[in-house]
């Protein structure tokens, strides 16, 4: 999920990819920050105010990084209205690999469950919940028993 710490050399481009970080858009960022910080132990590493609210926040846990930007901030940041509207087309779907699905389920208690705990054909035990902005977060552990 999120930030990948490995470096990948692309064929024929001469470009090295060093990290991928999702930017998730929300009406209000504060509940999303609390979702990740309070439940899953992420740290807020950066924030940019937008009036009396947050316009942007960066969250990190180990090598995993997430960014949230408010719709209002995106509207100001991207001057093209058509592009700014793309932020509202969501939700985004995240796939988060964890080492203890049962501890993760406990931490996620109270979040709306989109897909109950299941074992997949590809060997993952997973559950999907919604974050406060409506983005779907699938937590998965490979090799676990449901």
What residue spans do the PLM features occupy?
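Vicinal oxygen chelate
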Residues: 2-23, 43-97, 103-130, 141-146
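Short acidic-aromatic low-complexity motifs
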Residues: 26-30
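Conserved active-site tyrosine of GNAT-family acetyltransferases
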Residues: 32-37, 108, 134
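Short glycine-/small-residue motifs
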Residues: 136-139
């Amino acid at each position: 999920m999120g930030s990948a710490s490995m470096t990948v050399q692309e064929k024929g481009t001469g470009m090295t990819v060093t990290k991928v970080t999702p930017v998730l858009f929300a009406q209000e960022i504060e509940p999303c920050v609390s979702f990740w910080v309070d439940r899953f132990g992420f740290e807020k590493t950066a924030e940019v105010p937008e009036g009396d609210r947050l316009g942007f926040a960066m969250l990190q846990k180990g090598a995993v990084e997430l960014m949230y930007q408010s719709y209002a901030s995106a509207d100001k940041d991207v001057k093209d209205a058509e592009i700014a509207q793309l932020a509202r087309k969501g939700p985004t779907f995240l796939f988060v690999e964890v080492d203890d699905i049962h501890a993760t389920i406990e931490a996620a208690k109270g979040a709306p469950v989109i897909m109950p705990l299941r074992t997949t054909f590809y060997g993952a035990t997973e559950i999907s919940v919604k974050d406060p902005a409506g983005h779907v977060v699938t937590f998965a552990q490979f090799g676990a028993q449901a």
